[in-house]
């Protein structure tokens, strides 16, 4: 028993380092395409609604297939499934970069959503296999840091590459995915798997339990916040191009800078500030503050007329989300007497649902007015805050019954 634990620890130390590098590289590759994706899709002839549906189709495929890949990794191993996800990133990026028709863009995004859904769930399962309970939080934190670092650096690189050629970031992203594949296959040890024997409820049952439980308000907050953010992300490049009169190449560079600034602000908040604020003010106040700050940021974006103010206002909205999401996760974890993993998993499902609905909504209302995605997102966040204060005024806390 002791030798097995020792081997598990050795694999864990080495595996976490390799996994950190792998997630960082693949997320940097994913981040590289973000500043140019909407510009490229518009150059092919996609409408704002179709651009929104591209994001929706990708998120929907990930929502459907992530649990399936996770189950498959329990049976055949973490490395093979993780590798399938990396191949999916590479192939889908290449197809997207070579596309000249809208249906080809959808093919690339749907295929990418199906296959890339194998990556992050398998990485999380790998951490569970190779860390003890007291080290698991640190392992998950490392993965979050790798993702955040990749997302911060990637868009800046993508914006620079996009200034020369809108297809180039997709090919660089594909190359980085293949580099990650080689790195992980050669250096990532296959762990001893510890699949759970507990029967898990279906997603439909999980949603029903969540909406009927004492934490329903915070699951709805997660859904609305993800919806609002996804509606913004699905149209931000179109808005910058139409409002600021940017070309596709100059717009890609400008949006890359915006992403980097927002990423740095969020990293500063998530890197330690949010924990101190939670200890001082509590999760509930921070959730409300984050929702209000994000709503203000969205409304400010509608009045921007240069890239500097767009970056500042987007950073305000990003700061609101950075305050809110960890506060919701902390509150749900603390107020769940058992099965925290299931509760956080349900929270992630609500987040995924918001990311499915938000882009389609953003692309649809963009036709009616380029500021409507942001105004409607701010209204949804404000309504969520209003529900919280209304419940408190009636003496019914949003978490009633949870203690």
What are these regions (language model features)?
Residues 2-13, 189-220, 403:
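Juxtamembrane intracellular "pre-TM" segments in multi-pass secondary transporters
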Residues 143-185:
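Helix-loop-helix hairpin linking two adjacent transmembrane segments in secondary transporters
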Residues 35-48, 235-253:
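Short amphipathic helix-loop junctions that connect adjacent transmembrane helices
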């Amino acid at each position: 028993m002791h030798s097995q634990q020792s081997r598990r620890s050795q694999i864990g130390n080495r595996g976490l380092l390799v996994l950190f590098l792998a997630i960082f590289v693949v997320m940097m590759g994913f981040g590289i395409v973000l500043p140019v994706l909407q510009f490229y899709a518009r150059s092919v002839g996609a409408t704002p609604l179709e651009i929104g549906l591209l994001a929706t189709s990708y998120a929907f495929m990930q929502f459907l297939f992530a649990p399936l890949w996770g189950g498959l990794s329990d049976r055949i191993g973490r490395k093979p499934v993780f590798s399938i996800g990396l191949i999916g990133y590479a192939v889908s990026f290449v197809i997207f970069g070579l596309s000249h028709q809208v249906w080809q863009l959808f093919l690339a995004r749907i295929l990418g959503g199906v296959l890339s859904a194998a990556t992050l769930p398998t990485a999380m399962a790998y951490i569970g296999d190779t860390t003890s309970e007291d080290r698991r939080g640190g392992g998950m934190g490392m993965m979050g840091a790798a993702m955040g670092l990749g997302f911060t650096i990637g868009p800046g690189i993508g914006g620079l590459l996009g200034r020369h050629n809108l297809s180039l970031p997709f090919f660089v992203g594909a190359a980085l995915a293949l580099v990650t594949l080689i790195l992980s296959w050669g250096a990532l040890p296959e762990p001893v798997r510890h699949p759970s024997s507990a029967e898990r409820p279906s997603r439909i049952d999980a949603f029903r339990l969540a909406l009927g439980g004492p934490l329903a308000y915070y699951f709805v907050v997660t859904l609305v916040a993800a919806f609002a953010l996804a509606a913004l992300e699905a149209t931000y490049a179109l808005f910058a191009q139409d409002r600021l009169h940017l070309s596709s190449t100059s717009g890609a560079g400008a949006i890359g800078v915006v992403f980097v600034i927002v990423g740095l602000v969020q990293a500063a908040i998530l890197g330690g500030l949010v924990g101190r604020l939670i200890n001082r003010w509590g999760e509930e106040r921070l959730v409300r503050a984050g929702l209000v700050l994000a709503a203000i940021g969205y409304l400010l974006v509608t009045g921007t007329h240069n890239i500097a103010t767009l970056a500042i206002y987007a950073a305000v909205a990003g700061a609101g989300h950075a305050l809110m999401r960890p506060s919701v996760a902390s509150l749900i974890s603390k107020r769940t007497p058992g099965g925290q993993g299931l509760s956080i998993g349900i929270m992630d499902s609500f987040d995924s649902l918001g990311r499915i609905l938000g882009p389609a909504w953003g692309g649809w209302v963009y036709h009616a007015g380029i500021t409507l995605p942001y105004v409607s997102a701010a209204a949804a966040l404000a309504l969520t805050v209003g529900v919280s204060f209304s419940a408190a005024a009636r003496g019914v806390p949003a978490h009633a019954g949870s203690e």
